[in-house]
């Protein structure tokens, strides 16, 4: 989660008692909103109204904020969007002097319970000099990007490689998440892995070092963009559609057999599919 800069020089009394949240769909049970409003007033003696909106694509969310169409207090972007928001001075530190005093008085420390791994990952985000991403954002949810597949048509072994996304046998049965970063990075890593194997730099079953993979995730050179473009053009001939949220239903209804998907959506789809007798599974390709 990142805390957004508020627009304007001051807040009206009504706005001061309003919390605007911009989050991914399906992340919070909206019944909790009314419960939180009640709980907050019981705890503080102050009323609060939650205005809760959802989005399904990072770039749509960011454009809405950058264009001045929203003054959200809290948003939930992916890590690369946090980097962009910090560069554009769109975020405020989470710990204002007043808030820091309050949590110190109550002996609350977020970092006492946060996973060291998650804290490390936030520290690795690119930020303007002298700024720590951990001061502007806290972890909310994290997961992986991989392949959700129908076990009737695809084996686990097949799903362990991104080769599957280019299998002509699956033409018009493939859906891909409409999320730039989550498609670009895996395809680039896959392409570079094949390239290294062809050059003899890697064995047939060897993978790129983790340091190289991390570098590729941030590689937006013209050469890499052109390489990914060439692979996406091949994939385009096989893909039935690009989805932001409806891929889960397509898999559950067996209208798609594989879907490049986030792990959270995959778990939801697997549970729903089980109820109707469809066997789905999820894996992260080895590349």
Region roles according to the model:
Residues 5-8:
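C-terminal motif of bacterial Sec signal peptides marking the signal peptidase cleavage site
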Residues 72-77, 240, 257-262:
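Paired acidic/hydrophobic, glycine-rich loop segments that form the ligand-binding mouth/hinge
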Residues 79, 178, 263:
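Short secondary-structure boundary segments
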């Amino acid at each position: 989660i990142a805390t957004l800069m508020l627009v304007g020089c001051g807040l009206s009394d009504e706005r001061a008692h309003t919390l605007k949240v911009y989050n991914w769909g399906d992340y919070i049970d909206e019944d909790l909103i009314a419960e939180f409003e009640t709980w907050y007033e019981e705890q503080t003696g102050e009323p609060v109204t939650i205005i809760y909106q959802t989005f399904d694509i990072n770039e749509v969310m960011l454009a809405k904020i950058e264009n001045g169409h929203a003054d959200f207090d809290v948003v939930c972007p992916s890590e690369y969007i946090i980097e962009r928001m910090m560069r554009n001075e769109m975020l405020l530190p989470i710990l204002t002097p007043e808030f820091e005093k309050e949590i110190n008085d109550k002996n609350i420390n977020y970092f006492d319970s946060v996973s060291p791994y998650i804290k490390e990952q936030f520290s690795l985000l690119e930020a303007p000099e002298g700024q720590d991403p951990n001061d502007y954002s806290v972890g909310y949810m994290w997961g992986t990007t991989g392949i959700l597949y129908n076990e009737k048509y695809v084996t686990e072994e097949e799903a362990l490689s991104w080769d599957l996304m280019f299998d002509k046998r699956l033409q018009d049965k493939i859906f891909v998440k409409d999320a730039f970063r989550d498609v670009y990075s895996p395809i680039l890593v896959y392409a570079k892995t094949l390239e290294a194997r062809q050059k003899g730099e890697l064995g047939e079953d060897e993978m790129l070092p983790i340091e190289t993979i991390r570098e590729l995730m941030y590689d937006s050179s013209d050469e890499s963009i052109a390489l990914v473009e060439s692979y996406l053009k091949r994939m385009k001939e096989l893909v039935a559609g690009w989805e932001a949220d409806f891929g889960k239903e397509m898999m559950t209804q067996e209208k798609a057999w594989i879907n490049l998907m986030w792990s959270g959506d995959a778990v939801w789809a697997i549970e729903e599919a089980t109820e109707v007798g469809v066997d789905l599974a999820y894996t992260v390709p080895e590349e």
